[in-house]
Amino acid sequence: MTHALLIGNPNCGKTTLFNALTNANQRVGNWPGVTVEKKTGEFLLGEHLIEITDLPGVYSLVANAEGISQDEQIAAQSVIDLEYDCIINVIDACHLERHLYLTSQLFELGKPVVVALNMMDIAEHRGISIDTEKLESLLGCSVIPIQAHKNIGIPALQQSLLHCSQKIKPLKLSLSVAAQQILNDLENQLISKGYKNSFAYYFSRRLAEGDTLIGEKAFTESLLIKLQETEQNLDVLLADARYQKIHEIVTLVQKKHSDASEHFTAKLDKLVLHRFLALPIFFAMMYLMFLFAINIGGAFQDFFDISTETIFVQGSGWLLQQLHAPNWVIALVANGVGKGINTTITFIPVIAAMFFFLSLLETSGYMARAAFVVDKAMRAMGLPGKSFVPMIVGFGCNVPAIMAARTLDSERDRLLTVMMSPFMSCSARLAIYAVFVAAFFPSGGHNVVFSLYLIGILMAVFTGYILRKTTLKGHASPLILELPAYHRPSLRRLLRETSLRLRFFVYRAGKLIIPICVILGGLNAITWGGGISSGEANTDSLLSIIGQWITPLFAPMGIHQDNWPATVGLLTGMLAKEVVVGTLNSLYAQVGHVGEIAAAHFDFWGGIKAAFGSIPANLSELGSALWNPVSASAADSELSQSVYGIMSRRFDGAVGAYAYLLFVLLYIPCVSTMAVIRQEANKRFMWTSIVWSFVVAYTTSVVFYQGAKFLDHPQQSMIWILAMSLSLLFVLAVFRYSQYGMGRQNAAANT
């Protein structure tokens, strides 16, 4: 077996190459001692097994104690600690000179290296030609030109891994005699300490460049003190010598003609990064994303809803009825398992459209610019602009958004981002928004969704600001981020990335929704006395009693006693937001006897025909749906219309529905998010996030509802608004004067 490390700069196409090499044979875990994700994969070449470990993207192998992210520490440490046979160094052919800096450091390890020269087609399009044979001769290692996104050059790269036993000699750098002598002395001291010759050579260069995390701390610190006494600028001299050598190589192997794409990127950036137009363009892009998800995705929602409703809910109910099964069994299977499957599959098109648009923004190069656009506004409040990149990831799911915070250099910035990310509207919340928009907002539904996303962003910024003034005081680190050139992503790549994200989401949602729906069906069938109900609408069931007992707590935000299913939806939503829609569908259907009607009038072929007929009907109305997105999102089946009708009667109109959505937006996303906060920060931050999110959600929802209903009962509304305002001020005071000192605690101490 051959074990290869995959390493390269950020945005070099490393992950695309990893996917091309390993396909579905991948494993995801964590690096030892930290929560940074570790990706490994393997593939067979004949009878030879090759294992690939994907290291985090880095610009350099120098690891300092401060000013470096966990990802960079992992990459720098892995090339030393892991057992491997060779290194695959992925280089962006469009930025050869910049990427060869990391290559020059890898050569100093003395390990076999294969250079994968990626994005050759893009380089040619930009007028860049590279003599790969000459580059191979000058570097002394295999150089394989590839196009990872098109699978071009992958077989040649795979073959090169079978013949990568030749060790690489470091590049000869032009250093002064004094500087070279210092490096030799460092190397000899390391050898005398027991280091192997190859590692001693590598460590001496890292120490000279200011690496403080290698070797034994006491020994390396003593060497660094001596180094500073003899030559304080050795790190600068080394970097300069590297760039001189790299420039010589690039001059010999690369020819660059006029670059039309660079001119295009520069011209487009003048507009996208314009001082006054940048923010409006950013909000316009976000707005287009919601329009696309609600309308284009919603056009296919009826097909999934009607077809799965016909097969899994009505079909299973009819079949069990023919078998003379008890009503509680029909309710458990049809409105439990069947409704769970129906709910999971129904919101696939909206979520898929969301993921597709996010992938388009990321691969086109705009997402990196979004961080720069919001950087100035966020830094004015002392918040890191770079944190907005993980927060945008939160539009898909809060869990990877929080995990992406590990790429931030500052511990303070990382913790701020971890605490801010849960307020970003994830795709699971979008499924809830789509249902309520269809039921309560017959026009301008996309504006409602946009407002919720905007409120989530503002609340995240507000949370960061409060933490900056209390437990996480300090200054935001400067934003240093590479702006990639604009790309025209292929449809195949977009569909593949969308498919990977969607598959993970549906699997995660389905394994939660279906069991929850079964449990809810069971609780709704079991009475308080322990008996089994024979009907579907049972006000004496355990579920009904629990919901009715808790519902008065939510009365100030417009949830009345008869709307207890909405309360149960909030409770199950703490497990996962994907479950809320399934909970509401299941409970409202049971309360309204919808399942009985569906079973009595079951028409399989009629349902399938209606499902397929909904696609052209919705697509033909797409133009008007851009102004009225509900027409693309609402379900046309009798069952869906019945559920929407029950919902519209139970909630206090559009005001009550919007107050409910505000609570859904702001309270904890799911237990998975809380667990990740526990891992990425610590237990104290997790509980702080839980308490803060509930306080903010309850206060915002109550203040909105009471403010909207102020004319109906001014005295009552005024009391509630004042009470909520005072409660929020009290919580802020606790944050301000807290003696816990969360920001001083080691975030890795998970005790």
Curated annotation (Swiss-Prot):
Gene Ontology molecular function, alphabetical: ferrous iron transmembrane transporter activity; GTP binding
Record-linked Gene3D superfamilies: 1.10.287.1770, P-loop containing nucleotide triphosphate hydrolases
Compartment(s) where it occurs, according to its Swiss-Prot or TrEMBL record: Cell inner membrane
Database matches in InterPro entries: Fe2_transport_prot-B, Fe2_transport_prot_B_C, FeoB_GTPase, G_FEOB_dom, Gate_dom, GTP-bd, P-loop_NTPase
Domain FeoB-type G: 1-167
Pfam families for the chain: FeoB_C, FeoB_N, Gate
A GO term from the CC aspect: plasma membrane
Keyword DNA repair in annotation: no
Key words, A-Z: Cell inner membrane, Cell membrane, GTP-binding, Ion transport, Iron, Iron transport, Membrane, Nucleotide-binding, Transmembrane, Transmembrane helix, Transport
Residues at which GTP 3 binds: D54, L55, P56, G57
Positions with a binding annotation for GTP 1: G8, N9, P10, N11, C12, G13, K14, T15
Keyword match Cell membrane: yes
Binding site for GTP 2: G33, V34, T35, V36, E37
Positions of transmembrane segments: 276-296, 341-361, 385-405, 422-442, 447-467, 512-532, 539-559, 657-677, 685-705, 715-735
Binding residues annotated for GTP, in chain numbering: N118, M119, M120, D121, Q147, A148, H149
Protein's membrane topology: Multi-pass membrane protein
Homology family: Belongs to the TRAFAC class TrmE-Era-EngA-EngB-Septin-like GTPase superfamily. FeoB GTPase (TC 9.A.8) family.
Function: Probable transporter of a GTP-driven Fe(2+) uptake system.
Protein name, per record: Fe(2+) transporter FeoB
